[in-house]
């Protein structure tokens, strides 16, 4: 939110007391005024538990105020500031399967936007209303709703002329109408609710009634008549009923209220008649089947009777024959009886097999429907995040778009205008013809080349307007030809080395101040702004592709499989057009490193350019990840395992030098819910590893979060879980486990056995800080030797660096070259806080090697030096005291104060933990001039540390939980209309039949089955929640508890 935005005035409606108190605690962390009243008090934001018809809900709609979900408070509290309201507004998402009508779902958003568009003060601003209602609490509530919508409420005794509405109870309407005192139409009280929640603002009442009937009939048909034999007869009856009702409504001239009542009564009568017709049809079919069975039985009886008569006749004839013939006949009869019994038995088994097969098919169909519905929800959630959801299904673009040639004369004109440097006129000509023709690539390249040379400074914005209009009118997914068009367009007009080459040059130019791929304008600032604008266009391009893919898969998710035709720009750039490619290709690796580095740079300053660049890179990365995931879901790929093993581990290891606060900001900045979820999990695993807590390697699931991560969260906030070891700084071998991880992260195709000895894996949590330093520097050398993963830190400034990323400052401090250090510090633009590839600063190196004079010169000459800079929590003071350099420690404490003593490394060690002598500890502690003992100071620091650990873990788990429930449809709203019990039965059937059919061997269904079962057991599981989690006062922990409580309550209500 902007700093000058008005202060939030919050009210709530629809919440239970416990939940309202929990949300109220979160509001204490934010800048707002919370009004705890049952009456509407002219708030700015109303937080509603559900869609309802309460006084506050109706009044907020009438006044055009923000009506938001509770997630707005939870997420804002987690972020520490008020977030943008748009995505949290009731009406932002329309649930097709909800029992609320689309009009009611969108009412708050529609009225707010309508009042903002028209400038009207309220929904009733032209009303003069007389209320004929008994004076009580309800009448006062109606007055507040009307006044919120700026209606003029007039007493009945003082009724002037010009009354527009008379609102009365049903009992008084007829009597008051007969008096005709007000000369105005009468409306029932219900009319206010219908006007606000059901009325289409731009449509008349007939169309609204028509849409209501359509919704009603479709719901009834889906619920009652799907499997009935008389479905077609019922459908016809409903259509006739609806047509007759609409016709009568159009010709109705009576009062609005009486008309609506009669129409509703007639429609109900006709609906009952139609149900009777259906019952008659069912009865007729049942009678027909019964008659048919009787006829069959009668025919069988006649056959049996004739056979019996024939046999009796034959028996009399055979009595005259010899006993031998009789015995022969008896044996023959026995054979016939045995054969008949055998055939009858076989027919019974055949019928049973047929019935069993039908049951299997029916179960298979249910499971396939469930799988399609689950995928459809994931696609829909993805489309909503990219603002791509549509109510109507759009036709697929399957027609080739031909690059209609410009008329030769116009082409010659534009070419001559560009050659004559009449760029304004050339751009205007292109703009005027853009709706009818697709501009040739070479013309757009000619203009871009001049823009890069700073020849079109004034009109460069008009050029990007052409590109935006081109993307809107002719998107890349329109045809394979348009996809190729954009791939040709988005490359350097001079070098023509491809799309990825241009993207790389643009990012390096903005991030590292590198030169362009060819000679361009010397206006550095203007060039960087231009390069950033080109990156914005690229971001819009790929974001539109993700939006289209999500929408397309959502629209066609009912089909068994949808083949994605054509080549997408995103797929071509990052995965060379290969749909089955692994996630971490060279472009994706480089984009990940750039995104992480841009976040580090953003945190160093408030520069707008750096912040915008970080936002763009995060958005591009999120769009690429989301595209790969959605495409993988359509192909049946297990994206959960791939994402957890690849991207999550990559980012976690690359952010070793991030503090917990930096990681919170970094994870929250991801636009991709998938990326947030998996990076949060990887960081949480690392946190558990540092606390010696074992975690299983299975993919992320709700079961794992509840039964594994929640208990682990309690252990992170318990003292004594860490193993204290005094590290040795010099001479240890690198940690080979990280080298193995590095090979995986860099996407190198070599075998792990090459260059790596067969040794047992080491635990990173047991590696000392110095060992990690040597390890990270060796990684720097290794990564620089790889062509597909060039070192990025070497490009920070104009100073030369070695393969480890060490600058001249680093080397001077390592080698104790004081004179050279003083010379370097006197140079303009020198950065004393520059880091090498492993994250160490020159001050770290001086403290590590015990070069006291170098430390003294840095502290005296560089007041901007960062004494809290850390790698895995290792600060310069840690470095000095862990190597026994007490004098350096005293210098640092004199300049940094007591805050330096409170810093812990990744293993929880304080700087004074490295000091064995109690006397030296007291001397160092005395420098800070704290009026306390060392023991009390350490106890308070330890308590604060474990509180931070618990808060950070709660943040990570909250991110996992919220994003997981959002992606897989485990929110209470989604489960309510699906039916939790029905889902459980289907998924249990899925597991029971898993071994007998291939339909059920689907990882997504297996995951969802475990999630549903965990949801049902969640209330019992939370009874064993760790005590320290329950009592922690931190905002993230409280938000986590509120989320879990809401999930438990919703599951209990649904079940």
Swiss-Prot record:
Biased composition regions of type Basic and acidic residues, renumbered to the chain: 318-332
Location of the region described as NSE5-like domain in the Swiss-Prot/TrEMBL record: 407-1055
Classification via InterPro entries: Ankyrin_rpt, Ankyrin_rpt-contain_sf, BRCT_dom, BRCT_dom_sf, BRCT_SLF1, Slf1
Domain of life from the UniProt record: Eukaryota
Biological process, per Gene Ontology: DNA damage response; DNA repair; positive regulation of double-strand break repair; positive regulation of maintenance of mitotic sister chromatid cohesion; positive regulation of protein-containing complex assembly; protein localization to site of double-strand break
Cellular component annotations (GO), alphabetically ordered: centrosome; cytoplasm; nucleus; site of double-strand break
BRCT domain ranges (all copies): 2-80, 121-199
Parts forming coiled coils: none
Quaternary data: Interacts (via N-terminus) with SLF2; this interaction links RAD18 to the SMC5-SMC6 complex. Interacts (via BRCT domains) with RAD18; this interaction occurs in a SLF2-independent manner. Interacts with SMC6. Interacts (via BRCT domains) with RAD18 (via C-terminus and phosphorylated form); this interaction is required for efficient repair of UV-induced DNA damage.
Notes concerning its domains: BRCT domains are necessary for its targeting to ionizing radiation-induced nuclear foci.
Task performed by this protein: Plays a role in the DNA damage response (DDR) pathway by regulating postreplication repair of UV-damaged DNA and genomic stability maintenance. The SLF1-SLF2 complex acts to link RAD18 with the SMC5-SMC6 complex at replication-coupled interstrand cross-links (ICL) and DNA double-strand breaks (DSBs) sites on chromatin during DNA repair in response to stalled replication forks. Promotes the recruitment of SLF2 and the SMC5-SMC6 complex to DNA lesions.
Protein name per UniProt: SMC5-SMC6 complex localization factor protein 1
Lineage: Eukaryota, Metazoa, Chordata, Craniata, Vertebrata
Gene designation: SLF1
């Amino acid at each position: 939110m902007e700093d000058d935005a008005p202060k939030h005035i919050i009210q709530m409606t629809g919440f239970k007391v416990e939940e309202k108190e929990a949300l109220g605690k979160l509001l204490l962390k934010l800048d707002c005024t919370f009004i705890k009243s049952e009456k509407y008090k002219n708030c700015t934001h109303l937080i509603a538990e559900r869609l309802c018809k309460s006084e506050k809900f109706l009044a907020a709609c009438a006044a055009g105020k923000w009506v938001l979900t509770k997630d707005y408070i939870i997420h804002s509290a987690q972020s520490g500031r008020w977030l943008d309201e748009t995505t949290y507004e009731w009406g932002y998402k329309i649930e097709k399967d909800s029992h609320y009508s689309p009009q009611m779902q969108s009412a708050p958003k529609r009225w707010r936007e309508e009042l903002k568009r028209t400038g009207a003060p309220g929904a009733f601003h032209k009303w003069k209303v007389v209320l004929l209602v008994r004076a009580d609490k309800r009448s006062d509530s109606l007055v507040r709703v009307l006044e919120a919508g700026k209606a003029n409420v007039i007493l009945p005794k003082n009724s002037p002329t010009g009354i527009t509405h008379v609102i009365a109870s049903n009992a008084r309407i007829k009597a008051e109408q007969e008096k005709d005192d007000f000369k105005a139409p009468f409306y029932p009280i219900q009319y206010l609710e219908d006007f606000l929640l059901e009325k289409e603002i731009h449509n008349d009442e007939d169309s609204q009634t028509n849409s209501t009937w359509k919704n009603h009939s479709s719901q009834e048909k889906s619920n009652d008549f799907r499997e009935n034999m008389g479905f077609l007869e019922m459908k016809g009856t409903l259509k006739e009923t609806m047509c007759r009702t609409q016709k009568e409504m159009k010709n109705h001239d009576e009062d609005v209220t009486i008309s609506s009542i009669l129409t509703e009564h007639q429609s109900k009568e006709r609906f009952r008649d139609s149900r009777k017709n259906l019952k008659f049809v069912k009865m007729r079919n049942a009678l027909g089947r019964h008659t048919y069975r009787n006829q069959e039985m009668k025919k069988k009886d006649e056959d049996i009777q004739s056979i019996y008569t024939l046999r009796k006749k034959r028996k009399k004839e055979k009595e005259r024959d010899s006993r031998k013939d009789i015995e022969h006949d008896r044996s023959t009869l026995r054979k016939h009886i045995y054969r008949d019994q055998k055939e009858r038995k076989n027919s019974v088994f055949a019928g049973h097999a047929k019935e069993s097969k039908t049951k299997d098919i029916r179960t298979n169909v249910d499971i396939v429907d469930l799988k399609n519905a689950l995928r459809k929800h994931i696609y829909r959630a993805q489309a909503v995040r990219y603002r791509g959801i549509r109510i109507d299904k759009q036709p697929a673009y399957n027609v080739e778009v031909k690059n209609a040639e410009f008329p030769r004369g116009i082409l010659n004109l534009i070419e001559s205008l560009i050659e004559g440097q009449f760029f304004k006129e050339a751009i205007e000509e292109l703009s005027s013809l853009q709706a009818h023709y697709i501009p040739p690539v070479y013309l757009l390249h000619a203009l871009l080349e001049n823009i890069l040379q700073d020849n079109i400074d004034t009109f460069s914005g008009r050029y990007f307007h052409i590109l935006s209009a081109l993307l809107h009118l002719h998107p890349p997914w329109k045809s394979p030809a348009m996809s190729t068009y954009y791939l040709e367009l988005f490359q350097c007009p001079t070098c023509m080395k491809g799309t990825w080459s241009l993207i790389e040059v643009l990012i390096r130019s903005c991030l590292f101040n590198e030169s362009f791929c060819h000679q361009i304008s010397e206006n550095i600032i203007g060039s960087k702004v231009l390069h950033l604008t080109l990156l914005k266009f690229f971001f819009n391009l790929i974001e539109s592709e993700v939006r289209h893919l999500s929408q397309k898969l959502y629209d066609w998710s009912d089909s068994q499989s949808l083949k994605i035709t054509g080549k997408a720009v995103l797929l071509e750039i990052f995965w060379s057009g290969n749909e089955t490619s692994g996630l971490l290709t060279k472009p994706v690796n480089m984009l990940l490193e750039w995104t992480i580095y841009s976040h580090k740079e953003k945190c160093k300053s408030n520069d707008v350019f750096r912040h915008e660049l970080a936002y763009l890179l995060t958005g591009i990365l999120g769009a690429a990840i989301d595209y790969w995931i959605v495409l993988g879901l359509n192909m049946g790929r297990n994206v959960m395992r791939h994402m957890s093993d690849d991207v999550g581990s990559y980012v976690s290891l690359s952010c070793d030098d991030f503090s917990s606060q930096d990681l919170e900001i970094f994870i929250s900045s991801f636009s991709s819910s998938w990326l947030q979820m998996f990076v949060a999990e990887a960081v949480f695993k690392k946190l558990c590893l540092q606390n010696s807590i074992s975690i299983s390697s299975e993919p992320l699931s709700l079961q794992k979060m509840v039964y594994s991560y929640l208990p682990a969260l309690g252990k992170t906030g318990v003292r004594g879980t860490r193993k204290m070891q005094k590290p040795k700084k010099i001479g240890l071998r690198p940690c080979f486990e990280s080298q193995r991880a590095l090979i995986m992260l860099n996407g190198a195709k070599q075998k792990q056995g090459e260059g790596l000895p067969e040794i047992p894996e080491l635990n990173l949590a047991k590696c000392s800080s110095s060992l990690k330093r040597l390890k990270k520097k060796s990684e720097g050398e290794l990564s620089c030797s790889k062509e597909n993963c060039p070192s990025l830190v070497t490009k920070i400034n104009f100073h030369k660096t070695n393969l480890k990323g060490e600058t001249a400052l680093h080397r001077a401090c390592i080698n104790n070259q004081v004179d050279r250090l003083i010379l370097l510090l006197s140079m303009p633009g020198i950065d004393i806080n520059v880091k090498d590839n492993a994250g160490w600063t020159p001050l770290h190196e001086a403290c590590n090697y015990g070069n006291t004079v170098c430390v003294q010169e840095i502290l005296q000459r560089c007041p901007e030096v960062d004494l809290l800079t850390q790698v895995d929590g290792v600060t310069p003071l840690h470095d000095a005291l862990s190597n026994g350099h007490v004098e350096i420690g005293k210098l640092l404490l004199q300049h940094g104060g007591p805050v330096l003593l409170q810093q812990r490394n990744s293993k929880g060690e304080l700087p004074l933990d490295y000091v064995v002598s109690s006397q030296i500890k007291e001397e160092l502690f005395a420098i800070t001039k704290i009026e306390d003992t060392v023991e009390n100071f350490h106890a308070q620091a330890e308590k604060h540390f474990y509180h931070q650990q618990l808060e950070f873990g709660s943040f990570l788990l909250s991110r996992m939980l919220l994003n997981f429930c959002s992606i897989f449809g485990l929110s209470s709203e989604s489960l309510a209309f699906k039916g939790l019990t029905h889902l459980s039965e289907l998924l249990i059937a899925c597991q029971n039949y898993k071994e007998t059919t291939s339909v059920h061997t689907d990882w997504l269904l297996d995951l969802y089955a475990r999630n549903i079962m965990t949801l049902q057991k969640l209330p019992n599981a939370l009874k064993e929640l760790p005590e320290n989690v329950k009592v922690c006062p931190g905002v993230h922990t409280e938000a986590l508890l509120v989320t879990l409580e809401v999930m438990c309550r919703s599951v209990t209500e649904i079940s």
